[in-house]
Amino acid sequence: MTVLSEQDKIRLLADIVKIQTENDHEIEVCEYLKDLLSQYDIDSKIVKVNDSRANLVAEIGSGAPVLAISGHMDVVDAGDHDDWTFPPFELTDKDGKLFGRGTTDMKGGLMAMVIAMIELKQSNALKQGTIRLLATTGEETEQYGAQLLADEGYLDDVSGLIIGEPTSNIAYYAHKGSMSCVVTAKGKAAHSSMPHLGTNAVDILVDFVNEMKQEYKNIKEHDKVHELDAVPMIEKHLHRKIGEEESHIYSGFVMLNSVFNGGKQVNSVPHKATAKYNVRTVPEYDSTFVKDLFEKVIRHVGEDYLTVDIPSSHDPVASDRDNPLIQNITRIAPNYVHEDIVVSALIGTTDASSFLGTNENNVDFAVFGPGESIMAHRVDEFIRKDMYLSYIDVYKDVFKAYLEK
């Protein structure tokens, strides 16, 4: 049963695109969604992080099993609005595309889930189980909205979790984790004409970086068997087959020294230097392994001078490749999107890291949502109108089928 017209569905997306949630103000989307859901007798609750940032939780149905569905309300900065063909915070419908910041990442997926809930509720189609909507704040930064919901127990009883990030018609059963590591070297300043009176922090940090580079090389020589298989995703995006060595890069552990800063002026011995690393973790090389690795290299190079700080750490999430959510998606979605659904692991991260951790409870898990992932964070971001609309029907059928398993 269709409750909302195509025009209504586009209008609802336009309404939340209009709300400027560039890393803030998600509470305005919460209030909008709460009012919308109440019109269809769906109760919801706003869970605040602070006065401007909040999550929304809503439910339909009752009892077990519980299927959590989730999307984030924040968007990345739109940059210079003059660079956009159309205003970034006004939905523009042109040539079968819906333009606007967040249409793909990921207000399109979020609203598709909300509308699917509304239509299932109005048609009384849900005969068993509970659908729990978790609309989150702060996914684009530190996932603190998702972490708050996890800490307050909103995931404790779930059997399945769908994240509606844009996936280009790929169903992801797992994804890598992500860590940010900051290594600081502290030396002793001195005049450059008398460097022996100082301790060069840059030299110390260079030694650390070089040793860590060798450690990473050694790891990659043995990083050949992966629980997470990201090859199908990469081959679809690259439109070509990839070889065995390349597959080890995409499916395995990745570590990058992306920032190096040291010294302030040319005639002084630098007393401080910092190196920042982004690490993509996998089940075989998780956050505990990474922490131990950094501490080991620090001890070897010079623990009197070096420290490491880890400002963010999000676990890899894995589930069975053929879990019931994935099975339902691959069976149902082709009827609406008119192509077979590729199943893969994702090389990025989602709120599931905070929701599930390493998924020790073996929750059925899928990342699957409307939009082309390549459009995320871009100027002139858009989602195809037919894709947005079709995923509403996909979600309705997948939610219902999963709960009736």
Swiss-Prot record:
Zn(2+) 1 binds at residues 72, 105, 165. It is an enzyme of class 3 (hydrolase). Its EC number is 3.5.1.18. GO terms for biological process: diaminopimelate biosynthetic process; lysine biosynthetic process via diaminopimelate. Keywords: Amino-acid biosynthesis, Cobalt, Diaminopimelate biosynthesis, Hydrolase, Lysine biosynthesis, Metal-binding, Zinc. Zn(2+) 2 binds at residues 105, 140, 377. NCBIfam families: DapE-ArgE, PRK08588.1. Belongs to the peptidase M20A family. PANTHER family: ACETYLORNITHINE DEACETYLASE, PEPTIDASE M20 DIMERISATION DOMAIN-CONTAINING PROTEIN. This is Probable succinyl-diaminopimelate desuccinylase. It comes from Staphylococcus epidermidis (strain ATCC 35984 / DSM 28319 / BCRC 17069 / CCUG 31568 / BM 3577 / RP62A). The gene is dapE.
